[in-house]
A protein has these predicted regions:
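Eukaryotic helix-grip
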Residues: 21-271
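Bacterial N-terminal signal peptides
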Residues: 5-15
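N-terminal secretory signal peptides that target proteins for export/translocation
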Residues: 1-2
């Protein structure tokens, strides 16, 4: 009986500790995001291939999809969680900015364009042509419903950028903690022969042991790099599909209200 009470007490203590660690995890995530966004805004090249001939050759000549560590080795340790920060890049020959943006803003049909990673999606609201909220059901790393707030910005006739913040994540069935946050930052640059696409994704999952992380990509799909590659590959394949028809933005939806902003960081220790 004493052993049972001790076990119960330990279990409750662990559960309470996990609950208490969540606000700290969020604060550390907010600090990381603040530093990451400052880094993105201050870099000289709009897309990395502009100042990197080797990367440009890989994307254009070799037609490859490249992933790059955005801020050192992954995962980054958070209190009670782990964060992955990846940059992915692809060149889509023959694509145009208008067609690509139109496809990506078709939030009701994302499963048609990203069949490897998304099973369903629905646009919830929109404000004009630059602010959207939508929900999608992801297939990996598990069946996860994600609601996101998205803002598009057209910089000039040849460049777009877009940011997407998850506002709610919910794993269907048992909650393994595979995905707590999904922030993504997209850049699109049109040139004479096509469009450069670059994305930086910042994801957070619960803290897993070393063995789980080592086996994650093989057994459980805890692999944001792989998911990013799948998304870029599907994007290229879908926008180049012959006869692609993209519906107009739907009318009759509510406006989205104020755009979501991540919490700030009061400390100077963010990475």
């Amino acid at each position: 009986m004493k052993l049972a009470k001790l076990s119960l007490g330990l279990a409750l203590a662990v559960a309470l500790c996990a609950q208490q660690s969540q606000p700290q995890t969020q604060r550390e995530f907010d600090c990381y995001v603040q530093a990451a966004e400052a880094r993105m805004d201050s870099r000289p090249a709009f897309v990395l291939a502009e100042g990197n001939p080797a990367l440009d050759n890989q994307l254009v000549r070799d037609k490859s999809i490249q992933t790059i560590l955005a801020n050192g080795a992954n995962p980054h340790k958070l209190s009670g969680g782990q964060l992955y920060d990846w940059i992915g890049a692809v060149f889509i020959p023959g694509a145009t900015l208008e067609k690509l943006a139109g496809m990506l803003q078709d939030y009701d049909h994302r499963a048609n364009y990203f069949p490897e990673t998304i099973s369903t999606s629905k646009l919830l609201c929109r404000t004009g042509k630059d602010h959207f909220r939508y929900t999608m059901r992801m297939k990996e790393p598990a069946v996860i419903d994600v609601e996101s707030d998205v803002v598009w910005e057209r910089l000039d006739s040849h460049r777009y950028r877009c940011r997407s913040y998850s506002t709610k994540t919910s794993e269907v069935g048992k909650d393994h903690g595979y995905l707590r946050q999904l922030y993504s930052y997209w850049r699109f640059a049109e040139v004479a022969k096509g469009v450069y696409v670059e994305a930086e994704t910042i994801t957070v999952s619960d803290e897993f042991g070393a063995m789980t992380r080592a086996l994650g990509s093989m057994l459980m799909g805890i692999n944001p790099e792989k998911s990013l590659k799948h998304s870029l590959g599907s994007m290229r394949e879908s926008v180049l599909k012959p006869g692609l028809q993209i519906p107009a933005l739907p009318d009759g939806l509510p406006e989205c209200g104020a755009a979501v902003r991540p919490g700030g960081c009061a400390t100077s220790s963010a990475r």
